[in-house]
Regions:
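...captures the hydrophobic TM-helix bundle architecture rather than a specific catalytic motif
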Residues: 1-261
Length: 261
């Protein structure tokens, strides 16, 4: 990478991370598919794919941070492009969840057995752990907004506190959902209700994990003084992503846990 920026436009330099990220994503979803079909050793493929995805995220973020903080490549025009890129990325993620909701409503509004949920399924009580997780995520949306406002007012102490609280709440949400899965009375292969339930909520849980990692990166960057009230798009993008995760969970809670159960 060149250490000098002679223009304000975003010219992408050669990088291995897009290709490696694609290979990592393919391995992760291959492992997930094999795991769903209960192939032997599929868990190892799944774990390898997850490790590859996390490693790619780490090194790609490292390069982006270097370009922003040490090489001065993130000019105002580049930052505008990154904002559009993040918006389009979130829109593409919305389409993933639209597909899952479509599958769920198609199955629930016109069930083959005439009854929804199917008679052999004991649905989870929406006002037990799902409601607790809803309150946790809503609170985390407040803490990340508090952190953002603190940074805009150059209050670094509250900025850090807000990120830490959001990360803790995200970890608690993940732990509660894992506990819920462990104690559910139905498994992934127990019909269309179970498969759409686990695909939608599990994919959301993966997004919570990614968002928590995203905020953790922002925490370490904040501790190193990387953000200022004028320049903090890295954290702003993480906050957008976290709010997106919050909104998706509200739809999951209302449509799948409450109405669909």
């Amino acid at each position: 990478m060149s250490g000098e920026q002679k223009h304000q436009y975003h010219l992408v330099e050669p990088s291995p991370w897009p290709a490696l990220g694609s290979a990592a994503g393919f391995t992760l979803f291959l492992g997930l598919t094999l795991f769903m079909h209960e192939y032997p050793y599929s868990i190892y493929v799944l774990m390898a794919g997850l490790f590859m995805v996390l490693a790619t995220m780490f090194f790609w973020w490292r390069d982006v941070v270097r370009e922003a903080e040490y090489q001065g490549h993130h000019t105002p025009i580049v930052q505008i492009g990154m904002r559009y890129g993040m918006i389009f990325f979130i829109c593409s993620e919305v389409m993933f969840f639209v597909a899952f909701f479509w599958a769920f409503f198609d199955s629930s509004l016109y069930p083959d057995t005439g009854v929804w949920p199917p008679a052999d399924i004991v649905a989870l009580d929406p006002f037990d752990l799902p409601l607790i997780n809803t309150l946790i995520l809503l609170l985390s949306g407040c803490t990340v907004t508090w952190s953002h406002h603190a940074l805009q007012h150059n209050n670094r102490k509250d900025f850090i506190r807000g990120i830490v609280l959001t990360i803790i709440l995200g970890a608690i949400f993940t732990a509660v959902q894992a506990y819920e899965y462990q104690h559910a009375t139905f498994g992934f292969t127990d019909g269309i209700y179970a498969s759409t339930f686990y695909m939608a909520t599990g994919f959301h849980g993966f997004h919570v994990l990614v968002g928590t990692i995203f905020l953790t990166v922002c925490l370490f960057r904040g501790l190193k003084g990387h953000f200022s009230p004028e320049h903090h798009f890295g954290f702003e993008a993480a906050a957008w992503y976290w709010h997106f995760v919050d909104v998706v969970w509200l739809f999951l809670f209302i449509c799948i846990y409450w109405w669909g159960g």
